[in-house]
Design a protein with these regions (language model features):
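Cytochrome P450 catalytic core segment centered on helix I
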Residues: 1-16, 88
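Active-site proximal loops enriched in glycine and acidic residues that flank catalytic Cys/His/Asp
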Residues: 127, 149-151, 170, 188-189, ...
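Cytochrome P450 I-helix active-site segment
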Residues: 1-2, 50-122, 129, 136-147, ...
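A residue-level signal for conserved active-site and pocket-lining positions in enzyme catalytic cores
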Residues: 5, 115, 242
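Cytochrome P450 heme-iron axial ligand motif
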Residues: 31-42, 50, 138, 172, ...
Length: 248
């Protein structure tokens, strides 16, 4: 992505409406990519690990999938071309997940998807109205700034039954196909949607699989109560202190 933007600094096609990107624009775009891809992913993983610690049945089901795909003291899912972890003899037959494993980690993806429904890192976004619109009894004039909250929409019982429940199994293919457009949009949507969405899904699934195949999560209940702190991203107000138990 950065390479494409750097080439844009030297490319100009007046007839096609392509203008050169100056150094300031390139710097701003690079900063956007780094900032948008850092804190959002960190918060998504934080909330996911917390939810797993509070829902042991879900955690166990996901771990069963990880063992099936990545191996667990046996040959299941083992790929001899990929070196196994050597951190402990008890996990020697578990290999590190790769991009090729992502399509097989269906339940892990559901866990991440449900986590970002309950706690979307990008919890609200703004849009400028380009024309006058009437929405119900409300008139939105051109150039108005409209705030759209993923958090509010993702907790709407019209679209998600029992919306405050962490329930990854709700994300069946049929259920996803029946959801109205933009009822679930953790990465925004339309032409201004997050350009890094495909990478973020891949990264999130692989990170969760890598961590949870080795460790079991326990939330430190002696720490402060878990509260929301909605800033640019949705983060836990007092941080998230976890205890890690190595799996055997």
């Amino acid at each position: 992505m950065i390479g494409l933007q750097m080439r844009q600094c030297w490319t100009q096609d007046t007839e096609a409406g392509i203008q050169r990107m100056n150094d300031t624009q390139l710097r701003d775009e690079v900063m956007t990519i780094f900032l948008a891809g850092h804190e959002t992913t960190a918060n998504a993983l934080t909330w996911t690990l917390y939810l797993l610690s509070q829902n042991p049945t879900v955690e166990d089901k996901m771990y069963e999938e990880l063992c099936s795909v990545l191996g667990n003291n046996g040959d299941s899912g083992k790929d001899d071309s990929i070196p196994s972890s050597s951190n402990s003899s008890s996990i020697d037959n578990k290999r590190i997940p790769t991009v090729k494993d992502v399509p097989k980690l269906e339940y892990t993806e559901k866990v991440l998807r449900e986590s970002m429904r309950l706690y979307p890192p990008a919890w609200t976004m703004g849009r400028h109205a380009i024309n006058d619109y009437k929405v119900g009894k409300y008139i939105i004039t051109a150039s108005s700034v409209i705030l759209i909250s993923q958090y509010v929409m993702h907790h709407n019982p019209r679209y998600f039954s029992d919306p405050d429940r962490f329930y990854p199994d709700r994300w069946t293919k049929e259920a996803k196909s029946q959801l109205p457009r933009f009822s679930y949009f953790p990465f925004g949507g339309g032409i201004r949607g997050c350009v890094g969405e495909p990478f973020a899904w891949m990264e999130g699934v692989l990170l969760i699989a890598t961590v949870c195949q080795q460790w079991k999560m326990h939330h430190d209940d002696t720490h402060n109560k878990v509260e929301l702190k909605p800033l640019i991203t949705l983060r836990p107000k007092n941080g998230m202190r976890m205890k890690l138990e190595r799996r055997k």
